[in-house]
Amino acid sequence: MSTVDFSQLPEPNLIQELDYESIFNERKEKFIALYPATEQNQWRTILTRESDPVVKVLQENAYLELLYRNKCNADARSLLLAYAEGSDLDHLALTEYGLIRLIVTPADNSVVPPSPAIYESDERLRERCLLSFDGMNTAGSANAYRYFALSADGRVDGIKVRSEQDSPYLLDVVITQVDSVNGQASEELVSIVQAALDPDHVRPICDRPTVKSSLATNYQIEAVLYV
């Protein structure tokens, strides 16, 4: 889950309104304004006829303008973290935050057909972009540990940072693994994340983070369905 709920943000002002009828009416008025005032009422009457060739040209012009505005909106959104997707988000993450999309599962060319690599989701990459600012400090904030844990390996999914009140410097960093059956992290992944959190430039000198896997609770539901 991202540290910011993008759905609560208002639509950016640079996103243009897409209203065909409004554009079409603007086109008609601009066309009429090209003629002397004595002829404008005549043209206004002519343009009420759907079959008139000039109306058809203005309709096409308005539709092309609608498509152009839609493309401008898409281009603008591709530059915003809240909206960018796919390769647009890759470029934004690299140029603005210095991050690249991590691999969850490497490609396997030994099978037929070859299995392509699986990369982290757009949502996860957005979260790392937001958390990257917390990663610039070594004050030991929970979000800083989240950032470094997520960046350690693309398989890291959920993260919970906790400490006891009487020993706040002893931290448990509990992780889940995205590609495991029950979410439990493997020993290999735990070791990778632990190595990422141990360096002095990552944690305060007094912090002792310990990475652990979450524990899965198996349960069975018995239900009676009435139809």
Regions found by a protein language model. Name each.
Residues M1-A139, R146:
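N-terminal polar alpha-helical/low-complexity "assembly arms" that mediate subunit docking
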Residues D134-V227:
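Carbohydrate-recognition loop of C-type lectin domains
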